[in-house]
Amino acid sequence: MLTGVRFLLAVAFALLCAIVYVPAQGPAKPHVVFVTGDDEYRSEITMPMIAEILERRHGFRTSVAYARPKPQTKDNIEGLEALETADLMVIYTRFRALPDPQLKRILDFSKSGKPMIGLRTTTHAFLYPEGSPHASLNDGFGRDVFGQKWITHHGHRSTTEVTIPEGQRGHAILRGVEPFHAKSWLYHVTPLHGTGNTVLLEGRSIHSDKIGKTDQFPLTQPVAWTRSYNGARVFFTTLGHPGDFESPSMRRLLINAIFWALGREVPEGGADAEPVTPYKAPETFDLSKVG
C-alpha cells in the first residue's frame, strides 16, 4: 500500500513539474497601435500598409485608429481605446482638435513611459483654437514629445535627397537602409528641442523655395532622429509623403524603428519590409478621392 502511495505521489509531483516548468512559447505579440489622421499625406493608407507588414511578416498584433466619418474629419478619431493595451504608439496626425476623451487617450499614452514613433506632420498633430485649454498642444506636443514643432518647409515643388551622417551607419535602425530620394519636401527643424537627440538621417532639399534664405533655412536638415520622453524610446521622422513608402529603405526605416523602440533586436540586414499587398502611392492633394 505504501509503495502505491509513493508511486501516486511521484506521478503527482512529475505532473506538477511539467505544469510549472513548461518552457514559454516566446514573448507575447507586441501590440502596435497606429493613430492616423493626416489626409494631406494619406496616413490612413500608408500606416495600414505598415501594420499589415508587421502582422504578416513579423507576427505583431496591430490596431489602426482612423478619422471618421472621413479622413478630413478633424474632431474624431475612432479606435483610440486600443491604446489601453498598446506596447507602442505610432502617430501620424495633422491639425486635429479632438474631444477631451479622445485626446486624453493619446496624452495618457505619451506620459506612460511606453515607446512612441511619430511621422512628419505630427510636429503639428493638433490645432486647437486660441483660448482652448489645449491650445498649448499645437506647438507643445510635437516639440516636447518628438523634438520639434511646425516651423516651415522648403516648398511643395521640392524633393529631398536622404543620406546617412558619418558615424551613424552602425545604428540598428539603419540596418538595410540606404540613401534614397524622397518625395517629401524638407522640413526645417533645427535646432532640435531638448537634449539627447541622435540624428540618424539627413536630407538635402532639391529645388528649394528657400534659395536666398539659406542662412536662416539651410538646405540640409535632420529628417530622422531618436530621443527619449518620460524614459521611453522615441523615434521621429519628418519624411512620410506616400511616395516615400515606395522605397524599401523608407519602409524598412520605420519597421526597424518599431523593433528598436520596443527593445527588440533588429534583424541583420534590416527587417523584412516587403508589402503584403502591392503598394502604389496614392495622390496627396486630390482629397475628392479620399474615402
Regions found by a protein language model. Name each.
Residues 1-5:
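N-terminal secretory signal peptides that target proteins for export/translocation
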Residues 29-35, 39-125:
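Helical hinge/lid and interdomain linker segments adjacent to catalytic or ligand-binding clefts
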Residues 91, 96-176:
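A glycine-rich, often tryptophan-bearing local segment used as a flexible ligand/cofactor-contacting loop or short
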Residues 45-49, 101, 105, 168, ...:
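Extracytoplasmic/secreted proteins, especially bacterial periplasmic and envelope-associated proteins
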Residues 37-40, 157-162, 240-248:
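Active-site rim elements
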Residues 26-30, 45-46, 56, 207-291:
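Extracellular ligand-binding/catalytic regions of CAZymes and related secreted enzymes
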Residues 55, 61, 73-74, 84-85, ...:
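Catalytic beta-strand/loop cores that center a nucleophilic Ser/Cys/Thr
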Residues 6-20:
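Bacterial N-terminal signal peptides
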